[in-house]
């Protein structure tokens, strides 16, 4: 089985823990608490601030990307009919084109 890792700059944030029709959940380990300084990921992906919060350790929260947002990114081209595996492969090719700091890696 392939492992899906999530990175911010050179720091591994976590691994993909679940995929369903609406959300992709990435568990953030406890030692990564300042990686999203100034709400970088929240701003970039429009995440609800309940999931990215300075007041709570990130280990207690999940970072959530909504598939509807992803479908609006031309690089992703994720279709509703795509299987979870197909979505993972497409997501693995995604990068933040503005900063090249956040990316998903398939190992």
Predicted segment positions?
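Phosphate/dinucleotide-binding and metal-coordinating scaffold of catalytic cores
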Residues: 1-107
